[in-house]
Amino acid sequence: MLSLSYAAAGELAPRGIRVNNVAPGWVDGGFTHQALAASDNPERLRERASALHPLGRMALPTDVANAVIWLLSNQAAFITGSMLLVDGGFMIQHNS
């Protein structure tokens, strides 16, 4: 997906169209709720997933939505071909 968005950003930039990626960490919703429901110990799984993030919690759906809204705004008008991590610091802790 990242390579596709980079290619699209380069191709569409001359037309004023910006293409970016949003890369969330664990989000407290959707698939995470399914995983928690299937777990023998959902509270322990929630604690472990939260502990993976230096901010100490999983993302909320609104955390990801707010990042997308910002990228769509005029405040991000000069940003294209970028990946925005919305991961509570997960990558800085686990990118070795």
Language-model features and meaning:
Residues 15, 20, 82:
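Rossmann-like NAD(H)/NADP(H) cofactor-binding core
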Residues 24-34, 86:
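Short, flexible catalytic-loop segment of classical short-chain dehydrogenase/reductase
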Residues 1-5, 19:
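Conserved catalytic Lys-bearing alpha helix of Rossmann-like short-chain dehydrogenase/reductases
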Residues 10-14, 77:
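Alpha-helical segment proximal to the catalytic Tyr-Lys
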Residues 53-64, 75:
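A conserved structural motif in NAD(P)-dependent oxidoreductases
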Residues 37-53:
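A short C-terminal helix-loop "cap" of Rossmann-like NAD(P)-dependent dehydrogenase/epimerase domains
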Residues 5-6, 65-68, 72:
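Short-chain dehydrogenase/reductase
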Residues 69, 80-96:
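Short C-terminal tail/terminal secondary-structure segment
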